[in-house]
Amino acid sequence: MLAVVWQFDVQDGSEDEFERLHGADGAWTALSRRSRSFLGSSFLKDLATPGRYLLLEYWSEMMVYEKHLADFSDHVEELKSQRAAMVRETLPLGIFDALDVPERHSPTWSVRDGR
């Protein structure tokens, strides 16, 4: 299992909109759910640094993740454009081998169909 990890530095006043875009019911997660390889995500807000967020997406296979990005490239670019208006900086932290992941029913775990 892969974990794709991003860090975002969100502009003051854009936090609510950013959280709606990337939250469990947001457009970014909805697009990811269209792939059977998408297993869920964790969306974290830094308590010590205002406006800093981490997004961890869990995918079953790298090839399917890459195919998903290619198949939905127009939609991905549209969402990235929306996000760019809200963030000062986007840092791709990397793609990791997920050794320990949250239970599928934990509060931060988003799954298909909202379950």
What are these regions (language model features)?
Residues 2, 39-51, 77-115:
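Glycine-rich beta-strand-turn "strand-cap" elements at beta-sheet edges
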Residues 2-9, 40-70:
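Short, well-ordered beta-strand segments in beta-rich or mixed alpha/beta enzyme
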Residues 9-22:
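Short, surface-exposed ligand-recognition loops at beta-strand->loop->(often short) alpha-helix junctions
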Residues 10-12, 61, 97-100:
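Non-catalytic surface loops within mature trypsin-like serine protease
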Residues 23-40, 58-95:
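An amphipathic, aromatic/His-enriched active-site/gating alpha helix that lines ligand/cofactor pockets
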